[in-house]
């Protein structure tokens, strides 16, 4: 894999660990739908895994009451366990599978319990310290691409075998 150049203030996703790291960050994470703030925290858990942009898990208590509805379907992560999907419902608008969580995470990832990650491409705005995050390509992965991360990123064309 040919790595993208890393500029000042950037980090390469190719320096992230596998299995992933999961650490609380003081960054301000804001998620908006239909002009409403549905999540706002400075206590998100930032998960970093080789070849993926970071994913931010928001503690459930920092998500607006009543906006999450459990969705059908599930998937599994070899590291974190079985994922539960969530729809976001705001002002009569339903965004299917807008986020996911690990309700019974695997050992080593217990601190993700009760936190929800949002797909930045499915909500109206996903902000990291005020910067709009771009979605990770491909639709399955939920990484948040900001100016501080360099790729290339899994999910882009030709990355299926990574």
Where are these regions (language model features)?
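Terminal leader/tail segments of proteins
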Residues: 1-162
């Amino acid at each position: 894999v040919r790595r993208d150049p890393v500029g000042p203030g950037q980090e390469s996703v190719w320096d992230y660990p596998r299995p992933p790291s999961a650490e609380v960050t003081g960054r301000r994470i804001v998620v908006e739908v239909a002009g409403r703030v549905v999540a706002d925290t400075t206590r998100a858990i930032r998960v970093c895994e080789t070849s993926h942009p970071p994913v931010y898990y928001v503690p459930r208590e920092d998500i607006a009451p009543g906006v999450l509805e459990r969705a059908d379907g599930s998937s599994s992560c070899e590291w974190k366990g079985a994922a539960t999907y969530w729809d976001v419902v705001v002002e009569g608008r339903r965004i299917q599978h807008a986020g996911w969580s690990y309700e019974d995470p695997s050992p080593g990832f217990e601190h993700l319990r009760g936190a929800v990650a949002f797909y930045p491409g499915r909500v109206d705005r996903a902000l990291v310290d005020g910067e709009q995050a771009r979605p990770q390509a491909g639709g399955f992965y939920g990484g948040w691409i900001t100016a501080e991360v360099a790729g290339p990123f899994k999910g882009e064309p030709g990355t299926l075998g990574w």
